[in-house]
């Protein structure tokens, strides 16, 4: 059963915010940093690893509420999603562009 959310449950929002606050750099991704489960997640992990950034990876495939909730939370339809010091930076294309432009 797929969960479709137009508004975000406060408990899920609190869980997401807690994850974002848990470390300076947090990546909501499919899979883990060691074993990404999609090319876009792997690309962001590759960029972060290449520049030596320590980050926390949150595997959205393990929790459907987080997987669907993060899209509502950020108002961004795709995963991965990168947060730096609590601020949403974007997804794969934006992270790649930031890396390529310095």
Tell me what each language-model feature is.
Residues 1-5:
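Short, Lys/Arg-enriched N-terminal segments with co-localized hydrophobic residues
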Residues 6-10:
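Short gly/ser/thr-rich secondary-structure transition/capping motifs
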Residues 12-14, 67:
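Eukaryotic intrinsically disordered and solvent-exposed regulatory patches
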Residues 16-54:
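Local sequence-structure signature of Cys/Sec-based thiol-disulfide redox active-site neighborhoods
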Residues 28-30, 58-63, 85:
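Structured beta-strand/turn binding interfaces of compact recognition modules in eukaryotic regulators
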Residues 47, 72, 98-101:
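Rhodanese-like catalytic fold shared by cysteine-dependent sulfurtransferases
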Residues 49-68, 77:
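Thiol-based oxidoreductase modules, predominantly thioredoxin-like and allied folds used
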Residues 84-102:
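Non-catalytic, surface beta->alpha helical segment in thiol-disulfide oxidoreductase systems
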């Amino acid at each position: 059963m797929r969960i479709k959310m137009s508004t975000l449950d406060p408990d899920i929002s609190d869980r997401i915010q807690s994850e974002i606050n848990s470390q300076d750099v947090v990546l909501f991704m499919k899979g883990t940093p060691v074993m990404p489960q999609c090319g876009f997640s792997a690309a962001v992990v590759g960029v972060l690893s290449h520049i030596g950034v320590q980050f926390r990876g949150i595997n959205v495939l393990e929790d459907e509420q987080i997987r669907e909730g993060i899209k509502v939370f950020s108002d961004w339809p795709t995963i991965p999603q990168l947060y730096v010091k609590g601020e949403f930076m974007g997804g794969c294309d934006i992270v790649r562009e930031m890396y390529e432009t310095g």
